[in-house]
Amino acid sequence: MSVAETFAAALPDLLPQHFPERLLGLGDSQQAIREAGSGAAIVLLHGIGSGAASWLQVAQGLCHKARVIAWDAPGYGNSAALAQARPRAEDYAGRLQSLLDALDIERCVLVGHSLGALTAAAFAQRHPQRVERLVLLSPARGYGAPAQAEQGRAVRAKRLDDLARVGIAGLAEARSANLLSPAADARALAWVRWNMARLNPQGYRQAIELLCGDALLDHLPQGVPCEVHCGSADGITRPEDCRALAEAFAAPFSLINGAGHACAIERPELVTGLLARALQASLTGSLQ
């Protein structure tokens, strides 16, 4: 077994003890989360090609400071899919509201990575009183704006065709490297691939509909402190695009040095640091 394969095998072994799964019944729906620590809540929403487990290393770094909760988005992991065939961000935000209610979380620092940024922003827009601070990591803009309708149709068709043609395993093999910088090591690649290989086709299809049918800029929250960060080597949500989104959100922006799109996997220590600062800012009202 290679070093990378050993690494990928070791991290899942850490999950039961360090970031265990918990299943909650939300009405007729089951929702899966991973949870560690206690204190002020920070809630982590993953992107389209990932899952709750991808936050393991960040959770290990934050669990001594906060209650860390990462969901498997609807249709991911052991979370029930949404009822809508073509859900929008507000549908995912509705599930998140039910989850936070079930967990007795009144307020939290809310973190959205990539496509998870749409859900995070939509929730903050609708429930600003429940979000201490909104953190967007390499946020996906979405293709739902009228000016991007043609591009959105093309992206949707290609992603659905790729899924039908090669399946989840094929996508994990072909796309994992795209989520990392050219300098990423084999261990990071193995962990990205492990997470992507566990996608559920139905949940992935619904996430494609969200990506191609909704737009982040339609969900600008009011009165919620926000910050935006992006990997300096992110080739998917490029730094210049994330900087423009930060300007639209009137939010501070920074680069995560040496990280590609999967910043929490490639540079977990830097992501942990910026989220620790966001937690501190939520308590003091200022970023240090």
Protein language model regions, located:
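Catalytic active-site module of serine/aspartate enzymes centered on a nucleophile-bearing elbow/loop
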Residues: 250-288
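Conserved alpha/beta-hydrolase catalytic His-Asp/Glu region
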Residues: 147-152, 164-221
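Gly/Ala-rich beta-loop-alpha elbow adjacent to hydrolase catalytic centers
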Residues: 112, 116, 120
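Conserved loop-alpha-helix segment in the C-terminal half of the alpha/beta-hydrolase fold
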Residues: 225-259, 265
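Alpha/beta-hydrolase fold catalytic core
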Residues: 1-42, 63-66, 105-106, 275-288
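Active-site loop/oxyanion-hole signature of alpha/beta-hydrolase fold enzymes
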Residues: 19, 27-28, 32-34, 56-60, ...
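Active-site glycine-rich loops that stabilize anionic/oxyanionic intermediates
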Residues: 47-51, 114
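Flexible "cap/lid" loop of the alpha/beta hydrolase fold
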Residues: 121, 125-126, 131-164
